[in-house]
Amino acid sequence: MLLSELKPNHDYAKEGKYLILSLRKKKGVRKDKFIEIPITWFDYNFGEKVEWLIVREYQPSVNGKEKYTNCKLENIHAQVSVVNVKGERMK
């Protein structure tokens, strides 16, 4: 599924789902090298020079603490996986 097809500012955890984004994390990493980040929520944040995606990471083992991260939209691969909390990938 494409990121543009998903609903921004929507809590996917309430539906028992999370998303897996592919993110180019560091400048020194090759342009075709991505890391996967599981998230439960995202929204767009448009700055003056850079478009950002603010995400809430999926961390099932953390004691009630939510981690929010800003990612440059240009560093996120357009293809996103939708996964049930049980670990089953969906279309």
From Swiss-Prot:
What InterPro entries is this protein classified in? DUF5513
Q: Superkingdom of this entry's organism? A: Bacteria
User: What keywords sit in the KW lines?
Assistant: Plasmid
- What is the protein name stated in its UniProt record? Uncharacterized protein pXO2-06/BXB0005/GBAA_pXO2_0005
